Each structure stands twice: as C-alpha cells, then as structure tokens.
Amino acid sequence: MKRKIVAGILVTAMVLSLTACGSSESTESSTASKNTESSTTEEAESSTDEFNPDTEEDAMTIEEVREKLGDVTVSKDLTLGAVEKSISNEYWRTLQSGYEEAAEYINEQTGANLTVEVDATTDESDETGQQTMVENMINQGVNALMLSPISDSNLTASVENAQDASIPVYNVNDGVISSADYYAGPNAYQNGQLAAEWISNKLGDEGDVAIVIGMAKAFAARERTQGFKDWIEDNNSGLNIVAEQNADWDRQKAKDLAATWIQQNPNLKAIFCNNDDMALGVVEAVKEAEADILVVGVDGIGEAYDSIREGGLSATIDSFPYYTARVATECALRVLAGQDMPRVVATPQALIDSENVDKDAAEIIGWTDATYVAE
C-alpha cells in the first residue's frame, strides 16, 4: 500500500556509504503468531484514526520551521514540563538529557532562566502513574507540556485539563494523543521502510524475515511494522514474512520469541524489531543458536551502537532522542512566543550500521541549533 509520507530528516545507509513495545508467549507456529499480531493491531488502530503524525499535511522539518519563522524569542523564567515513559530504557534517559541540555544552552545564549522539569515512570506499563505526573505539572502551573505517552489514550484526560488551563501541549514521539495541540517526533512509518530497504539490499531482495512488534497499544509499534510490510509490498520484494508477534518492548520476551522462530524457521534470514531493547534480546538468541541472521532495531541507544561495533546487532534506525528533545523544546518555546507553528514537526532519524556507526550524530543529521534571543 503506497502512502503519502511526511518527509523528516532522513539519512539511509546507502547514501552514507556513497558520500532509541500483544502476546508475550512463544507461538506454536509462525501462522499463529501472524494471526495474533493482526488481531491486536486492528483492535488498537481506531485510537489514532483522527490524527496520524506520519501522514499529517500540516507538517515541516525543523529546518523548514527555522527558515520560515526565524529566531526564537525566549521570555524570562519559563518552566516547561516533560513527562516520559520508562527511565529503565536508555532512549528515554537520552531524551531527558536532551531536554536538560537544551535548557542549559538556551540560558547560556539568553540568560532567560528557562527550566525543563522532567519526570518518568519506572516501567512502560504504568499508565496511571504517568497520568498523575502530568496532573502534578498542570497543578504546578508549567508554561507548556511535552508528553511522551505510554499509550494513545492514557493521557487524553490530562491533555484536556492542560488545555482548560491554557497550557499548550506537545506530544513528543511514541503514543499519539489526537487532542494534543502539536506533535514533534520521528516518522515511525519511515522507520519500518528504512529497515525493510536495508534488509532487502543485504539479502539480495529475497529470504524469510520476521518482525518483533512492541505493544499493540503503541502508535510507534503499529507504524513501524506497517512501514516495513508496505515497503515489501510496494516494491514487489522477494522478502517473505514468516513470523510476527508482540514482545511488549521487553528484551527477554523478544529473545524467547526469536529462539522459537529460529527453531521453527531454519531459513530465517532477518528479524526486524520495533525497538533496540528487543533487538538486543534477539541478538542474544541468534548468538546462542549460532545462526546467521540479520537483526535490525529502532531507537539508536548506546548499547545498540556497541553491539553493531562488536558484530552483534546488524543495524538500528536511530531516532536521535537527544535531538528530538532539543527540537521539542525549541518548538514549545516558539509556541509560547506566539509563532504560528505547524501541527507536526518531523525530527531527525538515520539508519546506522557498521558503515557509519562511528560518525558523529550531529554530522550525520547536519544538526545546528536555532538562534535564541532574550525577550
């Protein structure tokens, strides 16, 4: 199925060579696992029918925003509130660093005394705990919110409360809140497209492949999976999906799933995982089976980079959470300054493999900071 995609900052491994979530049980057969994933995905899709950041027409890259709107004026003593998913995942810890260092940089440039307060749950299933964190920030009176929801629905009521209090809300990656004022994050559908293209190139466009999916409730999991499948279909690829199953963003579940698939599918050549944590679990299963299987993840966490250097993980689609946070912070400040922002700002991402794993991230994505000025 061909889909119109909002173009973010996208760098593929091929271009570089030329110049960081269903059932948790192992299935009895690949067919059964495919049927299970299909049903859970279909049940979850309705929550984002109203808004899809990957296809939203009112969208720009951060470079396009800067070209159109210019410098960012920063008022004194602003407080931005950021609520993330689990701090046990390196992706979210890196996002936190991006928020905090963005504030430091902006204060150095402007003397504005900007504060970004970051909170996160201890695991990726505590939907109620995450909601409480957002409510606390609303009651505290933050000037804007940057939210990365666990699911597409757990923060809906909190977003409405924030809007009632005239607090603008940025939905930052992962779960999609249809009622949020704005969205900033990587194009999840493109994650899957990049992975499928890279695997196809490595395998000569033929071979059995499998997909380890995150949580069925998560927008990113569904979009990454669909992007992977659509690339295969749209390009009449010889890649053959023989198994797919949710592992709920859990490394051990992904490892167990992969171990079963390797036994059931002796011709399995590649496994695409919706995030790096699951991919690293799959790498363990592949090593233990002494199999020759490509493993591709998503997120670009440090452990994934290390595994690529060591010859374990084959590739990751780096969504650069550090720079996602810096983009989101910039966007929130632009809104507070009264600038007319697009509904969606696409953040940088790139495929990382052995060819570019040691290149500087800022160089890969061509990163520069915005110009910030004091009010």
Give, region by region, the residue ranges found by the protein language model.
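Sec-dependent N-terminal signal peptides of Gram-positive bacterial secreted proteins and lipoproteins
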Residues: 2-24
